[in-house]
Amino acid sequence: MFLLYEYDIFWAFLIISSAIPVLAFLISGVLSPIRKGPEKLSSYESGIDPIGDAWLQFRIRYYMFALVFVVFDVETVFLYPWAMSFDVLGVSAFIEAFIFVLILILGLVYAWRKGALEWS
């Protein structure tokens, strides 16, 4: 017997949480005034007249640092529940978490050797 009624709250939440942003975009698209002109295409600098061209290319030096940080920050999300239930899970969970951390350390060493942590 297929017990779909157990997940009714989940499906209702999923449908409502998906419909709210879609409806917000649709309503704003229908109700917003459409005025095209040079003011809409100009850059905004805190109420001051723009000076120069706002479309210039610049290098982001911290991109690789941010990327490595995000990878190792997400690791914390996976390790925190394991640490909270460490005493219940036993030795096999410890070995699995150790392998997980070892893979992350190998990734850090790889990023280090590739120069992702250099300031160049």
Swiss-Prot record:
Subunit structure: NDH is composed of at least 16 different subunits, 5 of which are encoded in the nucleus.
InterPro entries with a match to the protein in the record: NAD(P)H_OxRDtase_bac/plastid, NADH_UbQ/plastoQ_OxRdtase_su3, NDAH_ubi_oxred_su3_sf
Functional note: NDH shuttles electrons from NAD(P)H:plastoquinone, via FMN and iron-sulfur (Fe-S) centers, to quinones in the photosynthetic chain and possibly in a chloroplast respiratory chain. The immediate electron acceptor for the enzyme in this species is believed to be plastoquinone. Couples the redox reaction to proton translocation, and thus conserves the redox energy in a proton gradient.
UniProt lineage: Eukaryota, Viridiplantae, Streptophyta, Embryophyta, Tracheophyta
Entry EC no(s): 7.1.1.-
GO cellular component terms attached to this protein's record: chloroplast thylakoid membrane; NADH dehydrogenase complex
Highest taxon in the source lineage: Eukaryota
Protein name: NAD(P)H-quinone oxidoreductase subunit 3, chloroplastic
Keyword Thylakoid included in the entry's annotation: yes
Keywords of this entry: Chloroplast, Membrane, NAD, NADP, Plastid, Plastoquinone, Quinone, Thylakoid, Translocase, Transmembrane, Transmembrane helix, Transport
Localization annotation: Plastid, Chloroplast thylakoid membrane
